[in-house]
Design a protein with these regions (language model features):
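C-terminal soluble interaction/assembly domains
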Residues: 255-328
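Post-signal peptide N-terminal segment of secreted/secretory-pathway proteins
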Residues: 24, 85-116
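Solvent-exposed, polar/charged alpha-helical surfaces in well-ordered, non-transmembrane soluble domains
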Residues: 76-80, 93, 97-100, 104, ...
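Soluble non-cytosolic domains of exported or imported proteins
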Residues: 68-72, 89-100, 210-211, 291-295, ...
Length: 328
């Protein structure tokens, strides 16, 4: 039986048990999950994924920690991702929102991309995909994944880009600005205010990062712009959220997102840079937030969950107009 026939057979067995794509078995009845109302609107499962006996697609995952590839169903993979991307004691609805995003991310990845690790559908390499920390899975993470089993975001019959970051600094941003995304800014991702939790670490809410001039010059070159010996550093063009699109080094425009990656994204925590100063050999940046600023803010999700919002409400804030569907 070829792949398409296997997929069709598995779906034929699984979907009737769920009702017409809409029966949320074991779901919280107080949550009004927004579902696609027709088969035509459901995203298709990636063709290269096999369907397991439990009706859940199976992944080949390359683990960079032990350099081995193993097969697991998507639900098990999602548990490890949720535990890697959020602390396992976070509010339940924030964990659920992260689970739905993690599931959407891996399905879109398997649909559109190929892992750089031969024989794998995806890896635990954060440069390629998502953080994966199975040792941090606890009862809360399992509950969040179980209660959102098979659920993913859907946009016009496809998987949307399920971007997320740690802390928006107060406002999210367009992918074209914060990520240099060339695919066009999706309708479901617009700059929007994001109320961040006061429990976020102080060095995430506001931070300072100091580099040598040589480090700045090398990062500029690695980002594609040679600037020579650094004399001046200024902020250039900005997006709606205030994030830098360019940084002017010796008057030359350098891509701010690329510069951040090259100089160290864990030190220059975002491109929401409020000031830059040159003092002797030191170049000091001050800014807010952590991460690229596109899509869901994890500390914003934390705050919404603390306020009593559901996972659905959290996702609809950060991805307005996007639906949630149950695929298995």
């Amino acid at each position: 039986m070829n792949m398409k026939k296997k997929l069709a057979a598995a779906l034929a067995l699984a979907l009737p048990a769920l009702g017409l794509f809409g029966c949320m078995q074991n779901r919280d009845p107080s949550v009004n999950w927004r579902l696609s109302d027709s088969k035509a609107n459901l995203p298709k499962l990636p063709q290269r994924l096999e369907i397991g006996k439990n009706g859940v697609p199976t992944l080949s995952v390359y683990d960079v920690s032990d350099k081995k590839t193993s097969d697991m169903d998507i639900e098990r993979y999602v548990m490890g991702v949720v535990a890697g991307e959020m602390k396992n004691d976070w509010p339940m609805e924030a964990l659920k929102a992260q689970a739905i995003l993690a599931r959407t991310f891996v399905l879109k990845f398997c649909q559109d991309k190929q892992s750089k690790y031969e024989g794998a559908d995806i890896s635990t390499d954060v440069a390629e995909a998502q953080a994966y920390v199975p040792n941090s899975v606890n009862a809360r993470v399992r509950q969040a994944v179980d209660e959102t089993r098979g659920m993913a975001l859907s946009w016009q019959g496809d998987y949307p880009n399920a971007w997320f970051h740690a802390h928006s600094g107060g406002m999210t941003e367009l992918p074209s600005v914060a990520l240099e995304y060339k695919g066009g800014d999706p309708q479901y991702l617009k700059p929007a205010p994001s109320g961040e939790s006061k429990r976020a670490p102080e060095d995430v809410k506001a931070w300072t990062a100091t580099f040598t001039k040589a480090q700045v010059a090398k990062a500029c070159a690695d980002a594609g712009t040679r600037v020579g010996a650094v004399e001046t550093v200024e902020l250039g063009e900005k997006g709606e959220s205030g994030r830098a699109i360019t940084i002017l080094v010796n008057g030359k425009a350098v891509s701010a997102p690329s510069f951040r990656i090259q100089i160290g994204a864990n030190r220059l925590k975002s491109t929401l840079i409020e000031s830059v100063a040159v003092d002797g050999d030191a170049v000091t940046f001050k800014g807010r937030g952590f991460g690229h600023g596109v899509g869901l803010s994890q500390w914003g999700a934390y705050q919404m969950a603390e306020e009593g919002r559901t996972a659905q409400q959290i996702l609809q804030k950060y991805f307005p107009g996007v639906g949630i569907v149950e695929l298995w």
